[in-house]
Amino acid sequence: MRLKNRLFWIAAFIAFFLDQITKYWVVQTFSLGQTLPLLTGIFHFTYVTNTGAAFSLLSGKVEWLRWLSLGVSLVLIALALFGPTLNLWDQLGYGLILGGAMGNGIDRFVLGHVVDFLDFRLISFPVFNVADSFISIGIVFLLIASFQKTPTSTGRLD
């Protein structure tokens, strides 16, 4: 039996694995609050925890966000298993979002917070993590997919 939406599963696994391995490295290497300038004043690794969503939105809403992460993950898994065969961009987009949602969701359930460490100081951007990056990239891929879909004679998008 061939796995449907294979690229979805590959993207989800890679995103989840890279997120978890980088967070593990940060927790094992840094003290909370410690920073390592890679490009001083521009880009640092800074170990912080976040009880909110991506980029510290909804800070302090851990309980609600852990269930949201689980719900999003279950819906995306159901889509890939029981939905139609998705096009390339949809598979990549949904897969990256699943990997990121699962990565941050595991943190929320196990730790009660998310580990963040990517710190772009040049633009004063909130510290974030690899999962947040994959979720954002996944959304961009879904936008690309939406522009490639054309209406059929019945008015439906293919």
From Swiss-Prot:
Protein's UniProt name: Lipoprotein signal peptidase
Topology within the bilayer: Multi-pass membrane protein
Gene Ontology biological process terms in this record: proteolysis
Recorded superkingdom: Bacteria
Catalytic machinery residues: D116, D132
Coiled-coil positions: none
EC numbers for this chain: 3.4.23.36
Keyword Cell inner membrane: yes
Regions that span the bilayer: 7-27, 38-58, 68-88, 92-112, 125-145
Catalytic class of the enzyme: hydrolase
Functional note: This protein specifically catalyzes the removal of signal peptides from prolipoproteins.
Gene name in the database record: lspA
Family indicated by similarity: Belongs to the peptidase A8 family.
InterPro entries with a match to the protein in the record: Peptidase_A8
UniProt entry keywords in alphabetical sequence: Aspartyl protease, Cell inner membrane, Cell membrane, Hydrolase, Membrane, Protease, Transmembrane, Transmembrane helix
Catalytic reaction(s) noted: Release of signal peptides from bacterial membrane prolipoproteins. Hydrolyzes -Xaa-Yaa-Zaa-|-(S,diacylglyceryl)Cys-, in which Xaa is hydrophobic (preferably Leu), and Yaa (Ala or Ser) and Zaa (Gly or Ala) have small, neutral side chains
GO cellular component, one term: plasma membrane
Gene Ontology terms, MF aspect: aspartic-type endopeptidase activity
Pathway in which this enzyme or protein is active: Protein modification; lipoprotein biosynthesis (signal peptide cleavage)
Localization per Swiss-Prot or TrEMBL: Cell inner membrane
